[in-house]
Amino acid sequence: MSMPNPKKTAVRVQKVRLYPDSEMKQVLDELCDYRRYCWNEALALWNDMHEQSLILDDRKSRPSEYKVRNELVAEKQDWQYALSARVLQLSVSDLNKAFRNFFDNAQTDWGKPKFKSKKAPRQGFKTDRARIVNGKLLLDRPHESRHKKK
């Protein structure tokens, strides 16, 4: 008889169907576009860092989640401050997970992470700061947001 693993934790997920108005649809589209932009920039940077580490044969210059994220934050442009910083952080974290799965020998069916296209039928973003209050979705809002509450 095997004992249950005490380190297992339950993950609470809430799947919600949204019916956004035109303003909220624009905000969601901007967040999806920003996530795709962050993923593609992080992937390009990751590939460059990986090539440099192979050429220089230097283990210290290998890409990591923190190196890539810090580089992207240092190169942030003005328009990016109007959007949630968590989108950038979570997209780099997801890219790190994708590369870990790619290099994991136990998961042979995982392919190398690819650039995301705007033409893809499924667009999305992730946040860990959203709340539902009285049937309304509240997203985290950056300090310099263009979409202020009325």
Residue spans of the language-model regions?
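Nucleic-acid substrate recognition interfaces
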Residues: 1-150
